[in-house]
Curated annotation (Swiss-Prot):
Lineage of the organism: Eukaryota, Metazoa, Chordata, Craniata, Vertebrata
Role according to the record: Seems to act as a chloride ion channel. Plays a role in retina development.
Organism: Xenopus laevis (African clawed frog)
Name of the protein this chain belongs to: Chloride channel CLIC-like protein 1
Residues annotated as transmembrane: 198-218, 235-255, 347-367
Key word Nucleus present: yes
GO MF terms held by the record: chloride channel activity
Region (Disordered): 388-508
Length: 508
């Protein structure tokens, strides 16, 4: 009995379950102060490494079984040491890979938290000025980016997979984007106006006018077009532009008046309702007694009538010509008023009347001199011959039927009778000015027979001729210087010249 108890007491400490209550004082890295126990990660890591090594060994064993067996047969001690070194190297590589994987997972989790905070900050800053929604699906913001040397180093170390600090990188990203605001497309125009003191459109129009003047002078167009023609065209162009300008101004004014009338009118609902005969009679009596327009009529008139119809072109044209005359006079009168106010403010009242008379005389003299200086070149220009006045006048008036001739229809005197003074006999034919070689001569006709007295001959076209009056005969007679045959004896006969004796006159 005593022997049995001794054996039981001896075996009781040996039997029992293994627990993790034991604390290794030499391994403080794996000690968990919160739980007061040792961590199990090293054992898990060793187990994983053991299994990984075992797997690699099994793979090597399956890949090269024959080679391993031969090496074990030849040198068993060397084979064991070589395998140990190989397994040890693989174990170290696996430990390094495991640590690298853990470090990457840890850094990945930290970087995700950093970027979540960074994106959250962007949304908060953009939400202060408005985020996109259904009515405004796209938003354009402006922000400033700020960098320092420390921020740049942290960001570069993070991108290069180096050692980086979570807090430093978070502060760097949080301080990068500042001053969120909406993008303004016309901000550059304001900066331009602040820098140069002029609007962009005004500067563009000024440059365009300067370029037009340079082109006008450089291409010598002004030498071919007169100044009065250019001034006339400029006035016409200004009138056309002013017409469109004034029409747009009147349209805007009419539109503003219409909107003001619509804003003043109230109780629109009663205009769409039907009224009884008593209400209609009451409204008619009210309008007849007070001479006020019907508010519903004013409402529908303002609602239906377009402002475009309220501004006809004649109204814009009348305003254009009115402004063309009155606007310069307004500015001239304003300038004269300011001049007289400044001039007469320091002059006593007694001397103001002579000063005004003197100024009036000076103005009259100035306008007279200016008018004379302007009209003298105009009159000189009118006296000068221009391109349209250089056409030479004809030497003699031309006739439409130059090549048509008229035969002499007068009857020659009978034998033994002298011709009368008003008769012209055997006058040589007058050759036309343009007929030098005689190509336009009419056909020769036989002299008139005395028996044909009283007959009227015709020209080559067969049309009857009319006898010319005495004045034309007289002028022809004087121009020929009495070239008549000698008729002293009664028996003298008219001599036939070398040319035909038939009298031919140019038709009128």
């Amino acid at each position: 009995m005593r022997l049995f108890l001794l054996v039981a007491l001896y075996l009781s400490p040996v039997y029992g379950d293994y627990t993790d209550e034991w604390i290794d004082p030499s391994d403080m890295l794996n000690y968990d102060a919160a739980s007061g126990k040792m961590k199990n990660k090293p054992q898990v890591e060793s187990t994983q490494s053991y299994y990984s090594v075992e797997n690699t060994v099994s793979q090597d064993a399956t890949q090269q079984p024959a080679q391993k067996a031969n090496e074990l047969h030849q040198n068993p001690d060397m084979t064991c040491s070589a395998e140990y070194q190989e397994y040890k190297t693989k174990l170290e590589n696996l430990k390094g890979q495991l640590e690298e994987t853990k470090r990457m997972e840890k850094s990945k989790s930290k970087s995700q938290a950093i970027f979540k905070r960074y994106l959250n900050k962007i949304l908060i800053e953009a939400g202060r000025i408005g985020l996109p929604d259904e009515s405004y699906p796209k938003a354009h913001y402006d922000a400033e980016v700020v960098f320092t040397m420390e921020m740049l180093q942290e960001i570069q170390s993070f991108l290069n997979n180096g050692d980086w600090n979570v807090g430093a990188l978070d502060d760097a990203l949080s301080s990068t984007l500042v001053q969120f605001k909406h993008h303004n497309e016309e901000e550059w125009k304001w900066k331009f106006e602040d820098s140069f003191g002029v609007d962009v459109y005004t500067l563009f129009m000024l440059i365009l006018c300067v370029l037009c003047l340079v082109k006008l002078i450089a291409t010598e167009i002004w030498t071919h077009i007169g100044w009065f023609t250019q001034l006339k065209r400029l006035l016409i162009l200004s009138t056309v532009i002013s017409f469109g300008w004034n029409w747009m101004y009147l349209y805007k004014v009419a539109f503003a008046e219409r909107q003001a009338e619509l804003a003043k009118l109230q109780d629109f609902d009663k205009c769409s309702q039907k009224i009884s005969w008593s209400e209609s009679l009451f409204d008619w009596m009210k309008g007849a007694a007070t001479f006020q327009n019907d508010p519903c009529e004013d409402y529908f008139k303002a609602l239906i009538v377009s402002p475009t119809l309220m501004v006809p072109p004649t109204k814009a044209l009348a305003l254009t010509f009115t402004n063309f005359i009155t606007e310069p006079l307004k500015h001239i009168g304003k300038g004269i008023g300011e001049f007289l106010n400044a001039l007469l403010s320091e002059i006593p009242l007694f001397f103001q009347v002579p000063v005004l008379i003197f100024i009036a005389v000076l103005l009259l003299a100035f306008f007279y001199g200016a008018g004379t200086a302007v009209m003298n070149p105009v009159n000189l220009y009118r006296r000068l011959t221009g391109p349209e006045r250089e056409k030479p006048l004809p030497v003699e008036p031309t006739r439409s039927n130059r090549k048509r001739f008229i035969e002499d229809v007068r009857v020659p005197p009978a034998l033994g009778q002298l011709p009368r003074d008003n008769d012209v006999v055997n006058i040589p034919k007058q050759q036309p000015l343009d007929d030098i070689d005689g190509s336009n001569n009419p056909p020769v006709t036989a002299p008139a027979d005395p028996s044909d007295t009283g007959q009227v001959k015709s020209n080559n076209t067969g049309e009857p001729l009319v006898q010319e009056d005495h004045s034309i005969k007289k002028s022809i007679k004087e121009s020929r210087n009495d070239e008549r045959p000698n008729t002293e004896s009664p028996e003298a006969k008219p001599q036939r010249p070398e040319e035909p004796v038939v009298e031919t006159l140019r038709s009128t």
